[in-house]
């Protein structure tokens, strides 16, 4: 189904561009907003986003724009692909223009200092808007190159989910729906932390047993933490949980994996992030997740270990020794799903 009005995508990064392309390929008129006029002009003239998605042609139906006020006025369905550190700053001045809009967050991050997810920030800024999120095993370049992909749109608003499914669903991109917005969004944010650890392990040439252990124990940690906050544990067995975790912890295309790999090669955190040239949400998420898990007394040894390496001066060897000598635990915590 084609929307009667143009659809907005806010953000000029790789994921925003990939989603804008999908929408345009499905016959939607798309306005992709970005702050940088030079970037917008490059996309307009070269039909390519050379900074973030080099080599991928931008569909003619995608119009790069820099006038945010007009974009918000012209569009009803708005996909928000802004970094977690910028979302509030960009949208707060346009609060009135967001009333009654359908706002769908694509950002897998947590706001520093508040521990708010992106949809919670959108609710604060635009309490009269209708809110949803998209998350899943979705590497931007693979989406743009038409690899078969599935994602999850989550909202308590069934009509919003249906409209997003109709707008995005295509021959290579399948969209499932969920009502557990909090769990879907939390899964997308948390897995970024473990992707850094997976990249670090790969750079150190650790074995397949080790990598498998990291992914499965990461899933246990994520689920334990999310359930404590009220998420449905079953969400973490789906695309937005284990699906996203596997792809992000296995693929060199993942930004957070790349940061971890650079650290394993001997670069400092600052050098690793700088080499990326694009936001890796996992670094910021790690800081707030460590603080929150300590506050809530949730057992998260992998989070504590990675935090010790990145911010406390511990070596990987020291952390491995502490993890392997830790108190024996059960493999799986059985969590009742009644009430979700």
Swiss-Prot record:
GO cellular component labels: cytosol
One example of a Gene Ontology biological process annotation: glycerophospholipid biosynthetic process
Function: Catalyzes the reduction of the glycolytic intermediate dihydroxyacetone phosphate (DHAP) to sn-glycerol 3-phosphate (G3P), the key precursor for phospholipid synthesis.
Primary subcellular site in the record, as a coarse category: cytoplasm
UniProt name for this protein: Glycerol-3-phosphate dehydrogenase [NAD(P)+]
Keyword flag Cell cycle: no
Pfam families linked to this entry: NAD_Gly3P_dh_C, NAD_Gly3P_dh_N
Keyword annotations from UniProtKB, A to Z: Cytoplasm, Lipid biosynthesis, Lipid metabolism, NAD, NADP, Nucleotide-binding, Oxidoreductase, Phospholipid biosynthesis, Phospholipid metabolism
Catalytically driven reaction(s): sn-glycerol 3-phosphate + NAD(+) = dihydroxyacetone phosphate + NADH + H(+); sn-glycerol 3-phosphate + NADP(+) = dihydroxyacetone phosphate + NADPH + H(+)
EC assignment: 1.1.1.94
Family: Belongs to the NAD-dependent glycerol-3-phosphate dehydrogenase family.
Leading EC class: oxidoreductase
GO MF assignments: glycerol-3-phosphate dehydrogenase [NAD(P)+] activity; NAD binding
Residues engaged in binding sn-glycerol 3-phosphate: 108, 136, 191, 244, 254-256
PANTHER family, per database record: GLYCEROL-3-PHOSPHATE DEHYDROGENASE, GLYCEROL-3-PHOSPHATE DEHYDROGENASE [NAD(+)] 2, CHLOROPLASTIC
Pathway(s) it belongs to: Membrane lipid metabolism; glycerophospholipid metabolism
Binding site residues for NADPH: 14-15, 35, 108, 140, 255, 281
Active site as annotated: 191 (proton acceptor)
Gene (UniProt): gpsA
InterPro entries per UniProt: 6-PGluconate_DH-like_C_sf, 6PGD_dom2, G3P_DH_NAD-dep, G3P_DH_NAD-dep_C, G3P_DH_NAD-dep_N, NAD(P)-bd_dom_sf
Keyword NADP: yes
